[in-house]
Amino acid sequence: MTDNLTTTHGGSTTLELLAQYNDHRSKKDKSIEHIEKGTCSGKERNPSYDEIFTENIKLKLQVQEYETEIESLEKVIDMLQKNREASLEVVLEQVQNDSRDSYVNDQSFVLPPRSAERKAHIKSLNLPIPTLSPPLQQGSDVALETSVTPTVPQIGVTSNTSISRKHLQNMILNDEIEANSSFSSPKIINRSVSSPTKIHSEQLASPAASVTYTTSRITIKSPNKGSKSPLQERLRSPQNPNRMTAVINNHLHSPLKASTSNNLDELTESKSQQLTNDAIQKNDRVYSSITSSAYTTGTPTSAAKSPSSLLEVKEGENKALGFSPASKEKLDDFTQLLDSSFGEEDLVNTDSKDPLSIKSTINESLPPPPAPPTFFSPTSSGNIKNSTPLSSHLASPVILNKKDDNFGAQSAKNLKKPVLTSSLPNLSTKLSTTSQNASLPPNPPVESSSKQKQLGETASIHSTNTLNTFSSTPQGSLKTLRRPHASSVSTVKSVAQSLKSDIPLFVQPEDFGTIQIEVLSTLYRDNEDDLSILIAIIDRKSGKEMFKFSKSIHKVRELDVYMKSHVPDLPLPTLPDRQLFQTLSPTKVDTRKNILNQYYTSIFSVPEFPKNVGLKIAQFISTDTVMTPPMMDDNVKDGSLLLRRPKTLTGNSTWRVRYGILRDDVLQLFDKNQLTETIKLRQSSIELIPNLPEDRFGTRNGFLITEHKKSGLSTSTKYYICTETSKERELWLSAFSDYIDPSQSLSLSSSRNANDTDSASHLSAGTHHSKFGNATISATDTPSYVTDLTQEYNNNNNISNSSNNIANSDGIDSNPSSHSNFLASSSGNAEEEKDSRRAKMRSLFPFKKLTGPASAMNHIGITISNDSDSPTSPDSIIKSPSKKLMEVSSSSNSSTGPHVSTAIFGSSLETCLRLSSHKYQNVYDLPSVVYRCLEYLYKNRGIQEEGIFRLSGSSTVIKTLQERFDKEYDVDLCRYNESIEAKDDEASPSLYIGVNTVSGLLKLYLRKLPHLLFGDEQFLSFKRVVDENHNNPVQISLGFKELIESGLVPHANLSLMYALFELLVRINENSKFNKMNLRNLCIVFSPTLNIPISMLQPFITDFACIFQGGEPVKEEEREKVDIHIPQV
């Protein structure tokens, strides 16, 4: 009874002392925090810590000097008052001798020398859990040297001794000294982990040499940041009000009172575990090095001594040791012992009748023992009975904080190379009451973060196996008791996460066989600058879309790396290259979309994944979901589109991503929620663009929208638009069909301009792109080629009839009735020529073109080819979203018979020659519009006109001349002004034509040619010559000459090339008058003819060599032209 009162009285006294110290420490921390904040927030430069420290030392020395001087003066005065007869010199000498003696005494009181026997003179708070029986203590010295058992700090209190304040302070100070010595350096820690016995023997062999302790710098450390063991962190928290209660309980319920038989069993088990330490430490050196510091304080020497003798030695030492200033400074670190113990979580076992629980006699209020530095190797799973861990092992941070230890034996089978696993689930029957009282230390240190990151995914999946094992043990289910503020410390249950995902899964891993995945778009943009991949999950049975989600390419690659690292033998296709995601070319976009579809299809074709991989895939498809907002009432269609504008001299023609929204008859294009383009469909024409492999713009699933800004003029805006799939294109065209206005058909252009057409228009001569609204449209997903079969009637008759209109080089018969005679003579063999043409182009889809003025005014018709050889099946037409485009009756068309394109501008060269032509130099056949322009320029000295082809004429007059040529096919430009004067003597001067107007008309005709100047088929041949001889212009000229003489270039194209380049040569020769040298001509005609400068320049420089059989111009006589026009 007296002992209990004494203990209670000592405990209350200690609590009061700790409360006072805690207040002192809080004030000190606030002061330090205030100093640090003031230093960081100062605008002006404040002195550094080293400068302040140096100044502080100087001031302290100065104050000490002043105090010493004052003390000496006081002694002198005192001695003079006592002995007035003594002289001043004698008194000063005596005072000086006294000061020297006191200084020597202070110096000898600093620190005792460090000797090999210092362990015996230090108060050790670490006592082993198992107490050795007397026979074992006497006869098992070898075992003591080779086996280090887990220890827990205890405070020895005898029955007849009370815990005084001074006694407690001495114990705390000694614990600090022991802790600091164990954390002396990482090198010593690692050595102690690998061989505790060896490091102990080295310490015993060290000479008894005195060590001088010096401090060059004081470091302000937060109490929470000390490198302490988990046990020390738990016991040193100043915020824990029950910290002294725990210390006292550690003594009252010390493991020294446990039965010797139980301790002997656990010691035997620890010996078997010690044999596997070396192998485990190699794999988990980080964890071992962190946790081992908590156990190196207890040495075999201290374990060999009896508890009673050890307490007596330490008690005697505490009496001899007092509090010096140095020890008080060390006491400042005491709060680090108390910081982390506040709010931990214990596991308390419910009623259990397991026989194994007899081993543990420790009270439930006892704090958990520290974890041992090692854990069990999976290689010993076959000998589980002989290697059962101690109860304290189950709470080891090495086991519980190591992610891979949550693997069970079953989950390890799913991996080809299973990682290191623990036998914890298989050893659940060995759990004792002590393991249920064990609480988990704080989170692992920073050094192990990289290892946890690699193993984190596996632990989150298989950790439920550990929970299930704990709950199914024979000892009963675990019961968690939370103390106040217990959320800051994790426990066994908090670390072992559930197998279920922490996020809701839309599809469970076992349901992968019921879904299929489809990549909808790689152009999706969701509030980010980078494009994402939009993916849909579709129910395999019903075919309906379940939900959508978007992923960046970075996240896609992360999943790919994860699967290939966990399942190396999984046959997965390669993801698209990074270059494919850095371009917006429609063909490249289509390619990467197909590759991604194949990739995800192969993933979901795998019958079964390991649990961790399956959960990772389920989390991948269940995050970043995209909720499709309800479409607005005025929105007919919306989606991502690729847009390209026609190229100019200063602009580019690259593809850009736009989000299109069709509202009523207006198509709005947005770039990052900013409206950039607005297209009015009621005054626009639409034509399809075929998918050709040699398209240099990479057009795929595209169409052209031409918006006419103002009727009567040639001003129009062209928009080249591509979708990601052909089905998506048909959906857009189906939505557009409701807003095409037939009244705008007269102003629709019949073909795309030559300067902004892509290679999709590079069909053979005589083929055309039909406009949307007067053409049939393919309903299948196959590449659709657009052509006009109605214009190919009888080439032989056409040529013979057109030759009747040829006159001499000075004039031409401009009678327009010749065209009607031509139509009458050519109608007989129309059907025969049509069948022949279809036989040659069986893979093409025919499109009928209605561009005549009369038929265009009637209606805009869309017809379907009913030929049996058409690859478009009836089923595909019915299923096609664009079938409403094709339901327009073609009965009105059949009554009028076949229609012939009668427009000059925009028609092929052969068509223009059939309609009207002239002989140039009695050799070359030229369309009438070209011949009339050349005639006017030569007769009116246009080749000497300054700025010819560079200065633009009146757009109104040019448009008027275009319409007249389209209707009359031939207009005498040399007499045009006279006809204007004859009609109206007071006509405005703006109606007259000039050199710049005629040159602008010629450029307009060349720009509207649906094919290249020398033919689309011959383009690659000329380009090959340039590429092979790009540094040798002479060889380029000779190569062009061979191509011209070989007859590969059709006569019609050759005639136009000869006439045009001869004109440019003569303009270049008069460059001193017209200021149009070779460089300026190349700048103007390269975009007009849609050919690069490197291909255009030889035709002008070496005209005589290429067309007239002359010699190439010598290298020194050539004019250097260094021009680069973008996208030409």
Curated annotation (Swiss-Prot):
Organism: Saccharomyces cerevisiae (strain ATCC 204508 / S288c) (Baker's yeast)
GO biological-process terms attached to the record: establishment of cell polarity; negative regulation of Rho protein signal transduction; septin ring organization; small GTPase-mediated signal transduction
GO cellular component, one term: cellular bud tip
CDD domains linked to this entry: PH_Bem3, PX_domain
Region (Disordered): 194-241, 345-391, 418-486, 746-777, 796-838
Composition skew (Polar residues), residue ranges: 209-230, 382-391, 420-478, 752-764, 816-829
Protein name listed in UniProt: GTPase-activating protein BEM3
Recorded GO MF terms: GTPase activator activity; phosphatidylinositol-3-phosphate binding
Keyword GTP-binding belongs to the record: no
Keyword Transmembrane: no
Entries under Gene3D superfamilies matching the protein: Phox-like domain, Pleckstrin-homology domain (PH domain)/Phosphotyrosine-binding domain (PTB), Rho GTPase activation protein
InterPro entries on file: PH-like_dom_sf, PH_domain, PX_dom, PX_dom_sf, Rho-GAP, Rho_GTPase_activation_prot, RhoGAP_dom
Note: Present with 752 molecules/cell in log phase SD medium.
Function according to Swiss-Prot or TrEMBL: GTPase-activating protein (GAP) for CDC42 and less efficiently for RHO1. Negative regulator of the pheromone-response pathway through the STE20 protein kinase.
